């Protein structure tokens, strides 16, 4: 069991790391296709921007407006950030079943934190899954905020999180049994029932179970990594990474809503002088590459949650307009067009093809 678990886990790790590195490179090239923004408009006051990022993430200031959905999502988000140490623990357990993290392993506050977050992540994702199932488009039609969203991606992400959360919980129970936890204690305050359930098993069986569950945990994480790396337009997964720069680069450094006076129209990152416009100035957007890099980042960060759609008067009165579907369409078009643009393709202002036949071959 141990050898199989090691081989499967390490093979998936090599593939996953290679693909995620490639995906990061694709994102960098993709965002560079966007137009620049006026100098300093997205990078002014870096301290305040960093404060806003921490406040909006830890406080979930936007999500918590949605009640139980916001609370459940907060625990899932914190659980995702807690994944690295638990993943490191699982890798160590592939080689030594009773292995613990250096320094943190056995540190009571950390052990209690893992217990608490592990359970709350499972509860949080279960709540979100139930909410999704109760609001399926097949049940509620247009009233469902999930109408038009890519269902398989959401289900995939939800079941991955659930599987990883359960694996952490089961591993905690196995660890307690292997470490001979004889009575209820704070370090296993949530997983102690599993410690009792595994207590009568032999050391050999416990070790094989640790190898197996650690493999499940690692494999699930790496399968998720491989899947999202092959689908860089999968906003429901990639927002876990892209949301951080998206918040930091908000229009207002203090996190204020981007309302008020219309921003000056720009071309190539510079305001257009309408009294004497440049010959190559582009007014507005007629091609997806004419959006700014921040616009492309916005498209890719969309989670397809449908909250904007649920608030849209046009959508709610039976019209085809939906802000969610608009953003999704722009995202999909931008990602589909990116290879062509990166190969040198595109149109001049006169409508002529920029790339040669050799470049597009």
PLM region spans:
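Ferredoxin-type iron-sulfur electron-transfer modules in oxidoreductases and energy-metabolism complexes
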Residues: 272-299, 309, 315-361
């Amino acid at each position: 069991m141990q050898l199989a678990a090691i081989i499967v886990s390490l093979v998936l790790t090599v593939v996953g790391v290679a693909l995620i590195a490639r995906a990061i490179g694709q994102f960098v090239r993709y965002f560079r296709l966007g137009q620049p923004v006026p100098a300093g408009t997205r990078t002014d006051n870096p301290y305040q921007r960093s404060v806003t990022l921490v406040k909006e993430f830890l406080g979930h200031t936007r999500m918590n407006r949605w009640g139980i959905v916001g609370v459940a999502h907060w625990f899932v988000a914190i659980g995702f950030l807690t994944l690295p140490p638990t993943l490191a623990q699982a890798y160590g357990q592939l080689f030594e079943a009773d292995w613990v993290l250096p320094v943190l392993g056995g540190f009571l506050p950390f052990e209690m934190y893992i217990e608490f977050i592990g359970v709350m992540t499972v509860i949080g994702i279960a709540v979100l899954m139930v909410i999704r199932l109760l609001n399926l488009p097949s049940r509620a039609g247009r009233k469902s905020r999930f109408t038009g969203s890519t269902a398989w991606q959401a289900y995939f992400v939800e079941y991955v999180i659930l599987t990883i959360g359960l694996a952490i919980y089961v591993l905690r129970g196995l660890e307690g049994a292997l470490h001979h936890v004889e009575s209820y204690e704070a370090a296993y305050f949530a997983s102690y029932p599993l410690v009792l359930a595994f207590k009568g098993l032999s050391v050999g069986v416990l070790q094989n179970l640790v190898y197996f569950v650690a493999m499940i945990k690692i494999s699930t994480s790496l399968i998720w990594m491989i899947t999202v790396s092959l689908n860089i337009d999968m906003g429901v997964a990639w927002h876990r990474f892209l949301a951080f720069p998206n918040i930091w680069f908000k229009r207002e450094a203090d996190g204020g809503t981007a309302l008020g006076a219309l921003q000056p129209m720009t071309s190539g990152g510079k305001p257009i002088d309408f009294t004497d416009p440049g010959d190559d100035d582009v007014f507005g957007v007629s091609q997806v590459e004419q959006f700014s890099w921040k616009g492309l980042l916005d498209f890719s960060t969309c989670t397809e949650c449908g909250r904007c759609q649920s608030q849209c008067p046009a959508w709610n009165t039976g019209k085809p307009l939906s802000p969610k579907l608009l953003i999704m369409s722009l995202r999909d078009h931008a990602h589909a067009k990116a290879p062509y643009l990166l190969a040198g393709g595109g149109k001049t202002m006169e409508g002529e093809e920029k790339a040669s036949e050799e470049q597009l071959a």
